[in-house]
């Protein structure tokens, strides 16, 4: 594995002379016809091809690739099962591309599959992705009647300073091949995908952020890029800024000035009647006060529709920014870092489904790994005791209360309670508990103590007070509560989503029932 790591880092040691070099090329279709108006970039300069399909610009000192924004009318080109819209910059000056038209033309309807935080730290984690996530993604793609394209939302691996898991990047990349998951997957960098190994300082690596992204680039290609499907312009960007090179904790969510300028140029070639989707790792909801984030949100608001897709939090949330742009924050594919089958907010390991028609999102759902699409909620008794040998949290609400975790609920969803077959009333959304503090059950706690009870009480993660406990006591933005008229009644909770679909749960969890939380046990050989 170490050999793979060294080889990949060495592969990016290109053109480190620090002087600008002309980059030229021609873009044609498979019939040899030159293509005009194709957007080409090195991540800094943005230009388009002329009537003869030609482009030219001076490369930026820090640029590693030349690449194009894939037009909606052309197929996603694959290399070894992965999208490849780029070529590595070398001492050459000419970089030509050939695009293959889609047989049926532009795809008006398609599905985006959002995979947040696979976050593999070791071979067992990769094996769980291989055995659980990948086949589930493939099954979803097979069932979908429209073309499917996946997008990762960062933290492909779990590097953290001296705990360097970047050697797993080539392995997880292999598991993410289109043949393995049933669709091509575009990548977004996360804060745990950074390279903490020493990298030469110079014009090509002028900031900690640029130096730390080199391993990810070597494996997956450009960091800031765009592509088009139907009437949608899709952008992936790095939104992690590192303050120093030698401390993995010294980062914050934001965009650099260079990135904002690159995005401004990229969007200048997009018609205002299109929808723009921005894919990042850290939710922009976390950094709304940043001037560069506000600049990005302002640019996006100029289009007919705009959406943001993010991960990072290991919980599920829907958020609307002040300018009306909706952000989807997706639960992690790895849940609580593969220790269980659920995220810290009780949302199961899984991924998001975004269905698009024209320039509109026409449907959105969360798909739990290993479960049917209708698995959308879990119900608890208000006095239940959860956990295991490490700790046993008890809900303080009383036996006449029930709580429902509806992991993709929004304000336009209805959550109803039936007692003995008769409609009793609507559940009330609980006020979301803070991220820090609230580490034990209380009458004001909206957290999912069934999930927390498994991770802290059974597994023992974050059991002792410390910096990691909050990771396993995530806030829950979708917990509902109801007072039963008859605590002894047979209870059924019926959820109706914004499309009128109904999801039903008639099982109330009253204790440490953890068949759905416990991960499978695999025997993984050291060779694998």
Regions found by a protein language model. Name each.
Residues 61-77:
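A short, solvent-exposed beta-strand micro-motif common in secreted/extracellular proteins
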Residues 44-56:
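Short, acidic Ser/Thr/Gly-rich low-complexity loop/linker segments typical of extracellular
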Residues 325-409, 413-422, 477-506:
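Binuclear metal-dependent phosphoesterase catalytic core
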